[in-house]
């Protein structure tokens, strides 16, 4: 009887530890302190990302951000399907800054009423690259102002992501044209 009770307590304790670990993991992801949206606006090239169903077969993936007069950010994502010369896929949405986030946390909306987290977790001081994720770490994009990135810089970013608890082995480099 004592063994059965002890096992129940151990199982409950293990479950509790797993739940706390999951909660703490979500809470520990930090964004950059602040983002100047005027500097952030413009065209970004996807250098690498975690595989996403909606991006399957995408090459030459870009995102363009434009500040609207109404206070939100216009988001335009493009990619060429199945090859660098494939048919272009396009989607337009809006991003809304989360209050008191230093502009580093946004909610992106492509289809009403759904919004997704867009957290800027790493950003070059000259805005030459950015890393975007969500608090659950299921999404990850490494972005650059150019279609290629210096391999040393890329590896430094990947190293920082590993320190933050990301499964960097899931990262896939995006095929970009040299145009």
Question: What label would you give each PLM region?
Answer:
Residues 3-13:
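Bacterial N-terminal signal peptides that target proteins for export
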Residues 22-179:
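A beta-rich soluble binding module of mature secreted/lumenal proteins
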Residues 12-22:
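Bacterial N-terminal signal peptides
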């Amino acid at each position: 009887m004592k063994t059965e009770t002890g096992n129940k307590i151990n199982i409950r304790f293990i479950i509790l530890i797993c739940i706390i670990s999951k909660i703490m993991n979500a809470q520990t992801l930090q964004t950059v302190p602040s983002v100047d949206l005027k500097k952030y606006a413009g065209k970004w090239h996807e250098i690498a990302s975690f595989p996403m169903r909606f991006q399957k077969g995408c090459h030459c993936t870009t995102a363009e951000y434009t500040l609207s007069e109404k206070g939100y950010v216009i988001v335009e994502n493009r990619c060429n399907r199945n090859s660098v010369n494939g048919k272009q896929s396009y989607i337009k949405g809006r991003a809304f800054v989360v209050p008191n986030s230093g502009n580093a946390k946004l909610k992106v909306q492509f289809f009403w009423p759904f919004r997704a987290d867009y957290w800027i977790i790493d950003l070059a001081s000259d805005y030459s690259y950015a890393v975007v994720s969500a608090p659950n770490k299921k999404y990850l994009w490494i972005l650059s102002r150019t279609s290629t990135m210096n391999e040393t810089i890329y590896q430094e970013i990947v190293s920082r992501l590993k320190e933050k608890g990301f499964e960097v082995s899931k990262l896939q480099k995006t095929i970009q044209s040299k145009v």
